Amino acid sequence: MTVSIYSLFVIAVALALDAFGVSLSIGLSKNLRYKNKALFCISFGFFQFMLAYIGSYLGVLFNKYILVIPNIIGGIVIFVVGILMLKDGMKKDNKHMNIHKKMYFILGISVSIDAAIVGFTVLNSITSKLLLLESTIFIGIITSILCLIAFLISGYLKRINTISKYANYIGGVILMLFGLEMIFM
C-alpha cells in the first residue's frame, strides 16, 4: 500500500507543528546563534524521520500500549523546558540562552514522539522499505523546513521591543501551555 503525496504532506505538516511551536518559542530567546538554530532544525527533522520509521516497524503490536503515554511524556518535557526558560528570563545577566547539547536530543525526541504513533498507525501499511524510507525522510525534511520558518518568524518578532524584553517569559509560557496541551489532549 502507498500513501498519496498530498496525504503524506498533510501528515508531515501536522507532525511538524509541535517542532514549529517549540522552534518559535526557542527562537525568541536572546542571542540564539545560527548554529543552535541549525542544530535544532536538524535534530527535529532527524527525530521526526527516525521515530516515524521505527514506529512503522513496531506497528500494531505496541500501538495499544504506547498510544497515550508518549504525549504525556513529551508534554512534561516541553513543560519543564518552559519552566527553565522562565528561570533564564529571571536572571539579571540574560545575554545568552543556556543551550546544552542534551537539549537537541531531548527536545528532538519529545516533539517527535507523535511521529512514532503515525508510524504505528498509518505508515506501517507501506510494504516497500524504499517507499517507507522515502516517506519518512520527506516527513523529516518538512519538519526541518517548518522549524527554519519558525526561527525566521521569531527573528522578526524579537525586533518588537516588548517581545524582545520579555522573550524568555513569553517563550517559556508558550512552551508550558504547549506542554500542558500535549498532556491533556
Swiss-Prot record:
GO MF annotation terms: manganese ion transmembrane transporter activity
Q: Where in the cell is it found?
A: Cell membrane
Q: Which topology term describes how it sits in the membrane?
A: Multi-pass membrane protein
User: Where does the sequence pass through the membrane?
Assistant: 8-28, 42-62, 66-86, 103-123, 137-157, 165-185
Q: Does the keyword Transmembrane helix apply?
A: yes
Q: Which PANTHER family match?
A: MANGANESE EFFLUX PUMP MNTP-RELATED
Q: What is this protein identified as?
A: Putative manganese efflux pump MntP
Q: Which organism is it from?
A: Clostridium novyi (strain NT)
Native organism taxonomy: Bacteria, Bacillati, Bacillota, Clostridia, Eubacteriales
Q: Which gene encodes it?
A: mntP
